[in-house]
From Swiss-Prot:
GO annotations of cellular component type: small ribosomal subunit
One MF annotation (Gene Ontology) recorded for this entry: rRNA binding
Keywords: Ribonucleoprotein, Ribosomal protein, RNA-binding, rRNA-binding, tRNA-binding
Gene responsible for this protein: rpsG
Oligomeric and partner information: Part of the 30S ribosomal subunit. Contacts proteins S9 and S11.
The protein's name in its UniProt record: Small ribosomal subunit protein uS7
Functional description taken from the UniProt entry: One of the primary rRNA binding proteins, it binds directly to 16S rRNA where it nucleates assembly of the head domain of the 30S subunit. Is located at the subunit interface close to the decoding center, probably blocks exit of the E-site tRNA.
Length: 156
């Protein structure tokens, strides 16, 4: 990590179809080996499926799902006097989005549908309704933070 100056955040250009920066960011999270066109095909395919299945605007479903998955608190290990404590800390906004997208990707990968586009569509629809694997992960993280509330005075 450089000590001299803070490295500026790279600006991510909005995606071509919806003009949304979050969708473009999610495509980057989904992308493997620099194959952006494959990631685009998966995301847009999932959005088409959402429109077919739910009849809702896919961008609204995506925004709602990401909003539901975003964690508010998480736990970080802190060593105090020879013991490790799981200390609950608030998650900064940029990390909230990154975690939500990562959890969404992993939950979609674990589903049983045939194509990744179908899995992603299913996971997005469930997350927008407050269900699904990504929501389960968020609730698990929140439960851990709640259980370790007693150690919050060890904050960094």
């Amino acid at each position: 990590m450089p000590r001299r100056r803070e490295v500026p955040k790279r600006e991510i250009l909005p995606d071509p179809k919806f003009g949304n920066v979050e969708v473009a960011k999610f495509m980057n999270v989904l992308m493997l080996d620099g194959k952006k066109s494959v990631a685009e095909r998966i995301v847009y395919g999932a959005f088409d499926q959402i429109e077919k299945k739910a009849g809702k605007a896919p961008i609204e479903v995506f925004t709602l799902a990401i909003g539901n998955i975003k964690p508010v608190v998480e736990v970080k290990s802190r060593r105090v006097g020879g013991a490790n404590y799981q200390v609950p800390v608030e998650v900064r906004p940029s990390r909230r989005l990154a975690l939500a997208m990562r959890w969404l990707r992993e939950a979609a990968k674990k589903r049983s549908e045939k194509s990744m586009a179908l899995r992603l569509a299913g996971e997005l629809l469930e997350a927008s309704e407050g269900r699904g694997g990504a929501m389960k992960k968020r609730d698990e993280v929140h439960r851990m933070a709640e259980a370790n509330k007693a150690f919050s005075h060890f904050r960094f």
